[in-house]
């Protein structure tokens, strides 16, 4: 039969690239699970009353090249002015060796959070380096492996200050008046829900205020002033007030470490270390504190431990602080943070080393001195005598200066009364400084760079002598070796080789949606049109961004059944927090601020109760029945008991038990009956898109994990994006922003992230995914995800019982394998199976969530039948090994499972095990071998002997 031109054009070609099983493989799997078609399978599994009658209207699919061309045309509407706005964001020079070998490398960006340390030693080492950079520059004892951005780090610092404060009756948090405005915005938002009063005043007036438990200072101040806070911090410490300092990472290369001045907590943005501005993100925040406060710190902390052979190995330390264990009692709701960006900053420091970083910092400061000297020579007044890279210049004709700047395609900071702000950076050249002279003084200024340079080189007083760093930084060998591109390339490759990412094997983590992050989706994030915009540039310079964001928001509205989408939250946890704040403020607008009870099913993600606590709510747990579904009787009882105090319910759909609950609409109706709102966690949206939607089900608000359902890569633990979709009545209560008016959002609320659109530069990934898939492809992706999960469940059911199923014995897009019966019989645990899977070349499924003693498997739609069968065969082979243990062929204490994973060095070491080398490292015919570099980690040793900075190079060898 002759094909039509439309068929030959094949606009849906990407759908077949994204979805792993081809049509023949899909039919084989459908036959295996006993279904006629994808539609028939979906019809059996998804409750009839929530199935969409018509698909969401998000358009037809486009080819990769057509979508890239369309997005390039949109991006070209952005105007790339030279930015001197500052305020925590500067232009950078990302070394090409890091750009090509990390940011553009799926071996780095497709990995998951390092919960399985044996397959994560490379990025754990890079993160440990990041912590070492933080420790050296801040002068403190303990550092985390990144937070979401500087402003949210400030909010975390405030919360931490209250936790560790000895002034238990104090309830006021002091913020210095020269803190960045976006930071103050986020701090105020967080303080409101915690019931803290925020005081903003000149730092020197802090002692005039009573009942203060914590203080936030900025070094360098938002308008450029360097402060010597040594005496002030000493006085605050004598009064038991916890001191936090927001610090500029590049300035710290030259300035005295705040920790040395007595600060308790120091944080800031690592953006200046090689990460483009990207219209606001993503950027990693660094965070450090005194050792005595380590168990109150937020975020991941990488620690040095030992493996089963006694060798040095790295892991995430002190996880008992975190939301997935402590739930509403956690220090923070932060889970995934900004690992990929932290690793870029880490490797930027490795590549430049201390000498290179000092050269960059000194060059920035020298050019700032030259600019200052020239302006003062011509009669202009600087507001601050002490500065690093930012000048606050008083100008009589401010409008004229700004007009000349615009004509020269330059952005200055314009929100300072009777002055302009100018922040220089590592991209600034002497030619740029001459251009600034012309903008501020006119073309006939007569100034010469070399003459000014001679003057300031011998007589610079812009940094107080007491504020100059007098200690060495980055003395560890890792920062003093890899300075040629060859060495750097090989070092990065050596780290990458240690890890298991999607470029090597499927990562079947339940509730994580480790799907394809297509190359075509990733390409636009490094386009200068997207990468080089300042988040506070004039809106007319960001029309491309505005168009792309508006289009993406419109698609998400149609896919979710909501009325509006807010793009600001820069992680799923932030999305939860923002959604719950919208509910809280909605109730307050109706004079029902007393509604503060949040119902949460026992099966919920740990972030749910942690977020509810952060939003000022009380958590009440709703029971689940023996089938894993929400117990409607208990729900009604808890809702009735809460009565007029019921705020909301947080529910995940499909449930975390891997089934579509038949009564989800009834759950919504019960909560609405008692005046509550329904928060539907978007973690499992990959089983909804095109089939049903939160709004159609009856929910009021959801966050969407763009780093799951909509293809933003996990980056080894970030970046993420968690925009929220809301019904119309909640739209006025989504986050706003104090610096930038968000077009189309009639909101009066404070910000939850530093930038108005969160991590805007990764939004093109989701735009590309939706554009290339179209309505047809998006629905098919959800259906194949469901098919793949059911295929795995059906083939493994006899070996590993599936704990929960819905109608007709089906699961949704993931399934829970019950290991408990085997564990009781043989003592082989879910942990042993997880580690043994490494020997078979796989990352483990999710362990012991939501039920202890289980493995939760989510294959996603991107994995082919070949890969699914490889995983299934590995699991069946492991079951056969367990049977060998059960039969007494191998002893309980010495078998391939309890000794897993096995490493290369064991092949040449003395071998005393009752099984062969081949069984250990090439089980069941494994040919394409992934080699872990460490054996099983000793978690107890790591937490009892906490060490979170770089170890000698010899320890890695």
Curated annotation (Swiss-Prot):
Entries under Gene3D superfamilies matching the protein: Aspartate Aminotransferase, domain 1, Type I PLP-dependent aspartate aminotransferase-like (Major domain)
GO CC annotation, single: glycine cleavage complex
A biological-process GO annotation: glycine decarboxylation via glycine cleavage system
Alphabetical UniProt keywords: Oxidoreductase, Pyridoxal phosphate
Quaternary assembly: The glycine cleavage system is composed of four proteins: P, T, L and H.
Function comment: The glycine cleavage system catalyzes the degradation of glycine. The P protein binds the alpha-amino group of glycine through its pyridoxal phosphate cofactor; CO(2) is released and the remaining methylamine moiety is then transferred to the lipoamide cofactor of the H protein.
Protein name (record): Glycine dehydrogenase (decarboxylating)
